[in-house]
A protein has these predicted regions:
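Gly/Ala-rich beta-loop-alpha elbow adjacent to hydrolase catalytic centers
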Residues: 41, 45
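Patatin-like phospholipase
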Residues: 1-40, 50-345
């Protein structure tokens, strides 16, 4: 069956993004994946959008995705501690005013504490950034992980492996100083490194270090997770690619569809420490944005709604093939089959 969709919008959601792999498998099986020409995403949706932009098979996309070691993403120490830093840690532990807690703070947590004050985030995103660079490089002829491949490069098939044309990629970031979303794309930010834009888009406030960035034509600012302000950009393409009346029927053909996460509110999460508090704030922001979706029958009809069960979006203790990975993968596949079956009616 031929579907009307040309554009795909993906929601953010941390490790829930694994479910997009199951979604891709079903879209490919139905012939819908080949029709997608443009992708947009925030946070985890930006990561998946980048992978989908390569126009690989669902299996090859999963292979790239599975090379990510989720346990390394919340990275406490990016570089070896210098002697000066170790001395500062010992001096911190010796502070009588902080007793008894100061002596219990490890060197790793001390580094995180400094990062929180200096870079506005507990964890480093260096590992993730270098993983992104390696994945991007693998899709180019010269294949150099040290090179900064830009959005302009993504639009030049002659540079790509096998001269493969990529899908148009759009990434959502949040300019905290300007209080608004910023769009990264070949049209708006041709000279920006794609890996840097995706890193910005997944930088959950206070959980990961914020990114200092100068968006073209704007003052330098502090950038954080695009999902903070626009977690599910389902309407991103609507002005340029509006729905059209379906011939002979009293309904319209949508050019854009999307995938989002349906997380149960359930019982309150623990909030016993800073990390749990940050996780709760992030998930509260995502839930607040869900109100827009809940009051839009149109968006509901064109969305793959993936049930996440009791798996937390920041549950990084997950790896390919384990129980939670399989649950998310199957949740994405099941939701996609259900969505496509409704499209065929």
């Amino acid at each position: 069956m031929k579907y009307s969709f040309e554009n795909l919008a993906l929601s953010g959601g941390g490790v829930w993004g694994i479910a997009y792999l199951g979604m891709l498998e079903e879209l490919e099986r139905a012939g819908a994946l080949a029709q997608i020409q443009r992708v947009v995403g925030a946070s985890a949706g930006a990561i998946s959008s980048m992978l989908i932009s390569f126009r690989l098979s669902a299996a090859k996309t999963q292979e790239l995705s599975d090379s990510l070691d989720y346990s390394k993403i919340p990275q406490k120490v990016a570089d070896p501690a210098t002697p000066q830093l170790q001395a500062a840690h010992k001096a911190f532990q010796a502070q009588q005013a902080l007793e008894p807690h100061a002596k219990n703070i490890s060197l790793e947590d001390f580094i995180c504490l400094l990062r929180l004050f200096n870079k506005k985030g507990w964890y480093s995103s260096d590992y993730f950034y270098h993983w992104l660079k390696g994945v991007v490089a693998s899709q180019f002829k010269d294949g150099r992980p040290d090179k900064k491949y830009t959005f302009a490069d993504f639009a030049k098939p002659a540079l790509h492996k096998n001269d493969q044309p990529f899908r148009q990629l759009h990434v959502i970031g949040c300019d905290a100083n300007a209080h608004q979303a910023r769009i990264f794309s070949a049209e708006l930010t041709p000279d920006v490194e794609v890996a840097e834009a995706v890193r910005i888009s997944m930088s959950i406030p206070f959980f990961f270090e914020a990114q200092n960035f100068s968006y073209p034509g704007q003052p330098a600012g502090v950038f954080v997770d695009g999902g903070t302000i626009w977690n599910y950009p389902i309407n991103f393409f609507d002005d340029k690619y509006p729905a059209k009346p379906k011939q002979g029927e009293d309904k319209e053909e949508e050019k854009t569809f999307g995938a989002r996460f349906d997380a149960p509110l359930g019982k309150p999460s623990p909030d016993a420490n800073l990390i749990q508090h940050i996780q709760n704030i992030a998930q509260s922001a995502w839930q607040a944005q869900n109100l827009n979706y809940q009051y839009s029958p149109r968006d509901q009809a064109r969305s793959i709604s993936i049930k996440t069960g009791d798996i937390s979006a920041t549950e990084f203790d997950i790896s390919p093939g384990d129980d939670n990975y399989q649950r998310l993968f199957q949740a994405g596949a099941t939701a996609t089959r259900d969505f496509l079956s409704h499209c065929e009616r």
